[in-house]
């Protein structure tokens, strides 16, 4: 199971939010490329980046910072946040990003996502509140059940689904294993759990579930609750 550290970017700084609320942004580094190098030195192979400004603006607001992160490390990088066009996908991939996370557009335009998944490395981000998909920086909650959206992508050729329980995000109160497992079951493809990881025991619980391919960790590391070096050595 892949452990994937996360960097959320707001005005080129590494921040963490609570339940996706931009007003709760806490800055952890004004040099996120150094933070990325730190993750690499601890043993990470992947890095999860969200352009928070981009998620609301629908543009690559933090592209230059992401380019610097990519050039500073040998990490495989996945990026999400306001990516809605082929041109934007190409610009990220041309910058050295490994794969693209498509969130809001995965609900609004599934055919577009299925089309680009034929030619590019795509991950679908499904963010949910009480089981229903939230989009546009989590500002709007739809009537689509997360598990039903996951089913749409069962045979679409996407690499994975990132399943985020927004109610747990940044709360350090434990990952929602059942939610992630339900997405994995509905889609039949690799599912990465996100939101609420508080310590290494959460990672162990996900591993025991058996069908979770990865986990994204953020605030637990930043707040000193999770020893990433130990986690990587544990060979989950």
Curated annotation (Swiss-Prot):
CDD domains: HisA
A molecular function (GO) term: 1-(5-phosphoribosyl)-5-[(5-phosphoribosylamino)methylideneamino]imidazole-4-carboxamide isomerase activity
Assigned keywords, A-Z: Amino-acid biosynthesis, Cytoplasm, Histidine biosynthesis, Isomerase
Subcellular location, principal: cytoplasm
GO cellular component: a single term: cytoplasm
Cysteine pairs bridged by disulfides in the record: none
Domain of life: Bacteria
Protein known as: 1-(5-phosphoribosyl)-5-[(5-phosphoribosylamino)methylideneamino] imidazole-4-carboxamide isomerase
Residue stretches in coiled coil: none
